[in-house]
UniProtKB/Swiss-Prot annotation:
Assigned keywords, A-Z: Hydrolase, Stress response
GO molecular function, one term: trehalose-phosphatase activity
Entry's Gene Ontology BP terms: trehalose biosynthetic process
UniProt cross-references to Pfam families, sorted A to Z: Trehalose_PPase
Protein's name in the database: Probable trehalose-phosphate phosphatase I
Organism: Arabidopsis thaliana (Mouse-ear cress)
InterPro entries, per the entry: HAD-like_sf, HAD-SF_hydro_IIB, HAD_sf, OTSB-like, Trehalose_PPase
Stretches assigned to coiled coil: none
Length: 369
C-alpha cells in the first residue's frame, strides 16, 4: 500500500522497551508464543515528537487522509485514463473471488483450508452507529456451516465480548482488539481435532489500565464534537468520525492528539472513518493470523491454505502476511479500487456470504478421507 493509504502515527515521547507479558497465567505452557518486543529509536522518537507538535500543515494531511479513509467514488485519474479503464485494470489485478472460485479451489487441493474473517464491512454492513452493525441471520447460519467444514476465526478491531454478542457462535476462534485478545472455541464446540480448547492469548495485558484511562479522556475531550463516538475495545480504543461534519475534522484531530501526548507508549492508526488508539507493540492482525495458524499446528508446514477476508486498512497486515508466506490468499471487500496486498476481491457482505456458501457446498461434495 502507498503511504497515503496506510498511515500509522506513533505518538511517542520517550525511548523504551516494552516486554511481552509472559507471566500471564492464561498462556498455555505448551504454546510457543511469538516475541512481542518493541524498541523505540532516537530517530523515531524525534519524528514522533514532530508529528505530535506539528502545525496546520500536519493537521491538513490528517484531514486529507480522513477523506480518503472510506472512498465513495473512484479516485481522480489523469484525463488520458477513463474511470472504466482504471476499474478494469484493478479488477484484472484483483479478480472476483466468486468468478475465480474454481481456480481458488484447485490451488487449495490437498491442503487444509483455514478461514479468517473480519466483521464490520465483511460479515455485516458498515453503518453509522457501530453498536447497530448487526449480522443477518442468513450470514450467521452461513458462518456456522462454514465452521463445521473448516477452522474459522473472526479477526476484528472490536473487543471480543462485543463481537461475540453480534456473532453468537461458540465454535469459532475470536481475535479481538486487532488480534490482541485471542480466544479459542468454547469447550466442546470445536469439530476440528487440531483446535486447542484452552487457547487464550493477550499480548497487551499490561495496557488495560492505560486504555481505560485513554478512553475516559477521549470521551471527555470529544464530547464537544457532534457525531464523534468513542469506544473501548479492551486492548485498544477508537474514535469514529463517520457522523462528524467534515468542517469539524480538524478540531477532532487536535482533540485526539492532545490526549495521546500524555501516553507515549500508544500509537494512532486510521481505518475506515475511524481513529484507532492501541499499544505500541509489534502486534497486528497479521501477527494474530500467524499465532492462530501456529496454534492449529500449521506454523511450519505447507499443507495449509489460509483465506483472510476483510475490508479495512488494518486487514492489510494479514493480507501482506499471507502474500509473504506464499500460502493462501487475501480477499478485499470493496466496490472501489484500493491499493491492497489482497489477491482477490468481493464487492460487499452479500458477495462474501455467496463465497462462503460456495465453500461449504464445495467441502460437502468432497469425498470423506
Amino acid at each position: 500500500m502507498s503511504a497515503s493509504q496506510n498511515i500509522v502515527v506513533s505518538e511517542t515521547t520517550m525511548s523504551s522497551i516494552i516486554p511481552n507479558n509472559n507471566n500471564n497465567n492464561n498462556n498455555s505452557s505448551s504454546q510457543k508464543l511469538p516475541p512481542c518486543l518493541i524498541s523505540i529509536s532516537k530517530k523515531k522518537l524525534l519524528k514522533n515528537i514532530d508529528i505530535i507538535n506539528g502545525g496546520g500543515q500536519r493537521i491538513n494531511a490528517w484531514v486529507d487522509s480522513m477523506r480518503a479513509s472510506s472512498p465513495t467514488h473512484l479516485k481522480s485519474l489523469p484525463s488520458s485514463i477513463s474511470t472504466q479503464q482504471q476499474l478494469n485494470s484493478w479488477i484484472m489485478q484483483h479478480p472476483s473471488a466468486l468468478e475465480k472460485f474454481e481456480q481458488i479451489m484447485e490451488a487449495s487441493r490437498g491442503k487444509q483450508i483455514v478461514m479468517f474473517l473480519d466483521y464490520d464491512g465483511t460479515l455485516s454492513p458498515i453503518v453509522d452507529d457501530p453498536d447497530k452493525a448487526f449480522m443477518s441471520s442468513k450470514m450467521r447460519r452461513t458462518v456456522k456451516k462454514l465452521a463445521k467444514c473448516f477452522p474459522t476465526a473472526i479477526v476484528t478491531g472490536r473487543c471480543i465480548d462485543k463481537v461475540y454478542n453480534f456473532v453468537k457462535l461458540a465454535e469459532l476462534y475470536y481475535a479481538g482488539s486487532h488480534g490482541m485478545d485471542i480466544k479459542g472455541p468454547a469447550k466442546g464446540f470445536s469439530r476440528h481435532k487440531r483446535v486447542k480448547q484452552s487457547l487464550l492469548y493477550q499480548p497487551a495485558n499490561d495496557y488495560l489500565p492505560m486504555i481505560d484511562e485513554v478512553y475516559r479522556q477521549l470521551l471527555e475531550k470529544t464530547k464537544s464534537t457532534p457525531g464523534a463516538k468513542v469506544e473501548n475495545h479492551k486492548f485498544c480504543a477508537s474514535v469514529h468520525f463517520r457522523c462528524v461534519d467534515e468542517k469539524k475534522w480538524s478540531e477532532l484531530v487536535l482533540q485526539v492528539r492532545s490526549v495521546l501526548k500524555k501516553f507515549p507508549t500508544l500509537q494512532l492508526t486510521q481505518g475506515r472513518k475511524v481513529f484507532e488508539i492501541r499499544p505500541m507493540i509489534e502486534w497486528d492482525k497479521g501477527k494474530a493470523l500467524e499465532f492462530l495458524l501456529e496454534s492449529l499446528g500449521f506454523g511450519n508446514t505447507n499443507n495449509v491454505f489460509p483465506v483472510y477476508i476483510g475490508d479495512d486498512r488494518t486487514d492489510e497486515d494479514a493480507f501482506k502476511m499471507l502474500r509473504d508466506r506464499g500460502e493462501g490468499f487475501g480477499i478485499l471487500v470493496s466496490k472501489f479500487p484500493k491499493d491492497t496486498d489482497a489477491s482477490y476481491s468481493l464487492q460487499d457482505p452479500s458477495e462474501v456470504m455467496d463465497f462462503l456458501r460456495r465453500l461449504v457446498e464445495w467441502k460437502q461434495m468432497q469425498p470423506r478421507m
